[in-house]
Amino acid sequence: EDDVEIGPNSIVDRAALGETIVRKGAKIDALVMVAHNCQIGEGAILMAQAGIAGSSRVGRNVFLCGQAGVADHLDIGDGAIVAAKTGVTGNVKPGAMVSGSPHLDIRDWRKFWASAPQVYELVKEFKRLKARS
């Protein structure tokens, strides 16, 4: 459609049976892969080295940040933000912000990584106590 930009070395696969559609105003950065039968919504921005597997739908005004990957047959809701290097393995709700691999809601992802040092210390303490018994 109109006002679409596709950066260098990016690939938009042609569909065999359905349609691959990049809607009005979408921006596809360099080295992005859009597989067959995908739909990219109006105003979506796909950043460098992102990849979308076959038959997935990216909604309107979605940000798919660098090196993020979307598995096949998934739906990324309107206005969602997929952080860099995220591996999307399930549908993403409209307006959601996800990160990690596999993807988590950004709030859960932050809690998970904030607790990682504590978990490490708990494991060390457990091993110390186990060695004493």
What role is predicted for each listed range?
Residues E1-D105:
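Structural signal for interior beta-strand "rungs" in well-ordered beta-sheet cores
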Residues H103-S133:
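Long, leucine- and charge-enriched amphipathic alpha-helices
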